[in-house]
């Protein structure tokens, strides 16, 4: 490893932490916890028209199933999501965004994409340096 490799790794981690800090602040400014924002994105991003299961959400967020159940309960109380039984498996609950959840996610996603666009040149430069080192 060269000194430049450590510098590139440190810069990459810095860019990740900077984006995560931005994301947490944006979620809080929208009246959500960062985990609630991530759950909204997971539900929408999993792109199943029937909704996402609690297990899907747990897997996407890298949390335990019972933690995902508690998160879904809190989000349902805030009317960010709706729940219904899976028509194919009555043991499973499917979760979908409500209009309120869709609106919150749309607003947050716009500003996140703007932030990523601003960070893209620095990230691309760092990623290119990693690719160059693997040749």
Stretch-by-stretch model annotation:
Residues 1-30, 78-80, 133-135:
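N-terminal leader segment of winged-helix/HTH proteins
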Residues 11, 38-42, 103:
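Pre-recognition alpha-helix immediately N-terminal to the DNA-recognition helix
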Residues 14, 18, 60, 110-114, ...:
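Alpha-helical structural segments
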Residues 21-64:
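N-terminal helix-turn-helix DNA-binding core of bacterial DNA-binding proteins
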Residues 49, 128-135:
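Short, charged, intrinsically disordered terminal tails
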Residues 54, 72-73:
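Short, hydrophobic-biased segments on the C-terminal half of alpha helices
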Residues 73-131:
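Charged, amphipathic alpha-helical coiled-coil/dimerization segments
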